[in-house]
């Protein structure tokens, strides 16, 4: 578990820096938006990433606490602090997924070389981190909770929809439709 924690710490520290760079890029776009739609669109993305920063401010010290821990018995589902760490890690796996999508959206809008270069670098690092976190958390969750089912697993069921990086020149017509698996009953689906 120590090896995974070291990697998680590196990934989320790097992610925090990436979010700050991304937000710094968005700030002048929001301030100089041509219309309300553009301002609200990027402000919404900015606020979501701002919320992630506050979650990372909680997660990173929690990882550090367990990195320094010598009592292996504390790495157990019976330890509430360890359970919280696992919950925060699973939440941030989804946060990484969202960050990649935000960067992908920005890649469509910002076609200048400087921002394209920055965004592609941020995306590459975030995607690699996401893949590692996704894989390791699946292993950790299987190790500690045999009944665990990732509620977001449908995102990656048949193919990782984040794998194909969009380009600034892509058109909406080039996007292949995603086949959705028919879902069963849901809360409220039987209410008439």
UniProtKB/Swiss-Prot annotation:
For the region Targeting peptide, what residue ranges are annotated?
180-192
Q: Which residues bind Fe(3+)?
A: 44, 48, 102
Query: Region Disordered: start and end of each range?
Result: 149-192
Q: How does activity depend on temperature?
A: The empty encapsulin nanocompartment is stable until 86.6 degrees Celsius, when loaded with cargo protein is stable until 88.9 degrees Celsius and when grown in high-iron conditions is stable until 91.8 degrees Celsius.
Catalysed reactions, as listed in the record:
4 Fe(2+) + O2 + 4 H(+) = 4 Fe(3+) + 2 H2O
Write out the GO cellular component annotations: encapsulin nanocompartment
Assigned EC number: 1.16.3.1
Extract the GO molecular function terms from the UniProt entry.
ferroxidase activity; iron ion sequestering activity
List the keywords (alphabetical).
Encapsulin nanocompartment, Iron, Iron storage, Oxidoreductase
Q: What does the annotation say about its assembly with partners?
A: Homodimer, with 2 Fe atoms bound at the subunit interface (without encapsulin), probably also a dimer when encapsulated. 42 electron-dense accretions can be seen inside the nanocompartment which are probably this cargo protein, although perhaps up to one cargo dimer can be bound per shell protein.
Write out the function statement from the record: Cargo protein of a type 1 encapsulin nanocompartment. A ferritin-like iron-binding protein probably involved in iron mineralization in the encapsulin nanocompartment. Has ferroxidase activity even when encapsulated, the rate is probably controlled by the rate of Fe flux across the nanocompartment pores. Part of the iron-mineralizing encapsulin-associated Firmicute (IMEF) system. 2 different cargo proteins have been identified (IMEF and Fer); when both are expressed in E.coli with the shell protein only IMEF is detected within the nanocompartment.
The name on file for this protein is Ferritin-like protein
Species of origin reads: Bacillus thermotolerans (Quasibacillus thermotolerans)
